[in-house]
Amino acid sequence: MKDKQFAIPKATAKRLSLYYRIFKRFHAEKIERANSKQIAEAIGIDSATVRRDFSYFGELGRRGFGYDVKKLMTFFADLLNDNSITNVMLVGIGNMGHALLHYRFHERNKMKIIMAFDLDDHPEVGTQTPDGIPIYGISQIKDKIKDADVKTAILTVPSVKSQEVANLLVDAGVKGILSFSPVHLHLPKDVVVQYVDLTSELQTLLYFMRKED
């Protein structure tokens, strides 16, 4: 399954982990079958969106029969490569970086931060987190990435440094970056970037709250 490639819209791709989480929850609750309405209500979208999303993957269920929970849980696990551990690195150990270092990704999904980086003169460089994650100076980044064969990075550096550090990551062989900076990164087309802009998300939330008043 994991070798098969599906051409799907970006909006659908962003919901894949939600579907996987819901089917894992249904499975834990001993639910064997679920229809599109149940799935939609659990996620907070409409059932037509669920059916449209699933249509990109061929025949996942049958009308009037619903979806086999265990089968779909396995399907999305394969699709998201959640059957094996993905090692991740983190760059920038400020407040956000520290919070992410203490978040136990591997207990919830098959992702694990195995090392972190900051400026060479940062006081925590050369130490480890309570969970044993080593913290290195940025000058070591190329050698450490090569040794660990890490292709995915979380970027939590100040906006003014994000492009510079992203360039370092790409030069070292990183192919995927989750950036917490609002600055758009200009990188090669074969590097995948996802942005998490907490300020923008909060402003959007406040906008919809005002609309409800």
Curated annotation (Swiss-Prot):
Location of this chain's protein in the cell: Cytoplasm
SMART domains reported for this sequence: CoA_binding
GO cellular component: cytoplasm
GO molecular function: DNA binding; DNA-binding transcription factor activity
Residues annotated for NAD(+) binding in this entry: G92, I93, G94, N95, M96, G97
Annotated S-S bridges: none
Coiled-coil parts of chain: none
Record flagged with keyword Repressor: yes
Source domain of life: Bacteria
Keywords of this entry: Cytoplasm, DNA-binding, NAD, Repressor, Transcription, Transcription regulation
GO biological process entries: negative regulation of DNA-templated transcription; response to redox state
Pfam families in UniProt: CoA_binding, Put_DNA-bind_N
NAD among keywords: yes
DNA-binding residues: 18-57
Listed InterPro entries: CoA-bd, NAD(P)-bd_dom_sf, Rex_DNA-bd_C_dom, Tscrpt_rep_Rex, WH-like_DNA-bd_sf, WH_DNA-bd_sf
Transmembrane segments: none
Main location: cytoplasm
HAMAP family in the cross-refs: Rex
Quaternary structure (record): Homodimer.
Function: Modulates transcription in response to changes in cellular NADH/NAD(+) redox state. Binds to the promoter of the aldehyde-alcohol dehydrogenase adhE gene. Functions as a redox-dependent repressor of adhE expression.
UniProt family annotation: Belongs to the transcriptional regulatory Rex family.
UniProt name for this protein: Redox-sensing transcriptional repressor Rex
Organism from which the protein derives: Streptococcus pneumoniae serotype 4 (strain ATCC BAA-334 / TIGR4)
Gene that this sequence comes from: rex
